[in-house]
Amino acid sequence: MKGMRGRLFVMTGASGVGKGTVRAKVLERTRLFYSISMTTRPPRPGEVDGVDYYFVDRPTFEALVREDGFLEYAEYVGHLYGTPRAPVERALSRGEDVLLEIEVQGALQVKRAVPEAVLIFLLPPSLSELKRRLVYRGKDSPEKIQKRLEQAEWEIRNAHLFDYVVVNDVLEEAVADFLAILTAERRRSGRMGEALEMALRRDLALEAELDEILRRRYGGTGH
């Protein structure tokens, strides 16, 4: 809306819960500026710089850290990951709603930096189902899967720190729940200043015509 900042939505959840799949479906169905993360890890096969991540070397990343250029950042498995601040701020200033898809610790950092951010935690149906997804994803060793599950259990136990939770059991239901949250937040009365202002506007020329119709129909002034 004109003159209003956009809203910042943050999707997070355990590794393997399906954040990327839900995010892709959500972006197909509603207008959001998706903020691309930056990382020092090398691209995986099929990944494109500026689409999946901004791939940079460690000195470049660390220089941006010193310049306070990240909303959040963290080191994970030897590589740095972060959300560049400038693209997010530009989009919010234009009145665009922004979506981040980041890890749990990063999401909590964002909430501290931007208290009005809306945090949405994606839950697995169960830890056993999460383990099944991690196994069939085929990317991690048994040791790494166990570590991810331990981390996931800690994250789930802290889900109360987030504004909403969505269970990703049936994909389409999870997407519908996520979209419902976006709709509810967009309709909050505190965020609808321009819409409320427009609803109170009077078109004097139109009302004069209507008053004339009433006068002819009923006589008098039409009031």
Swiss-Prot record:
Annotated PROSITE patterns = GUANYLATE_KINASE_1, GUANYLATE_KINASE_2
Residues the entry annotates as binding ATP: G13, A14, S15, G16, V17, G18, K19, G20
Q: Does the keyword Cytoplasm apply?
A: yes
Q: Which residues form the Guanylate kinase-like domain?
A: 6-183
Q: Name one GO molecular function term.
A: guanylate kinase activity
Q: Which keywords does UniProt give here?
A: ATP-binding, Cytoplasm, Kinase, Nucleotide-binding, Transferase
User: Which cellular components does GO assign to this protein?
Assistant: cytosol
Q: Which reaction does it catalyse?
A: GMP + ATP = GDP + ADP
Coarse class of the protein's main subcellular location: cytoplasm
Q: What is its EC number?
A: 2.7.4.8
Cellular compartments annotated? Cytoplasm
Q: Which PANTHER family match?
A: GUANYLATE KINASE, GUANYLATE KINASE-RELATED
Which family does the similarity line name?
Belongs to the guanylate kinase family.
Q: What does this protein do?
A: Essential for recycling GMP and indirectly, cGMP.
Entry protein name: Guanylate kinase
Task: Give the organism the record lists.
Answer: Thermus thermophilus (strain ATCC 27634 / DSM 579 / HB8)
Organism classification, top ranks? Bacteria, Thermotogati, Deinococcota, Deinococci, Thermales
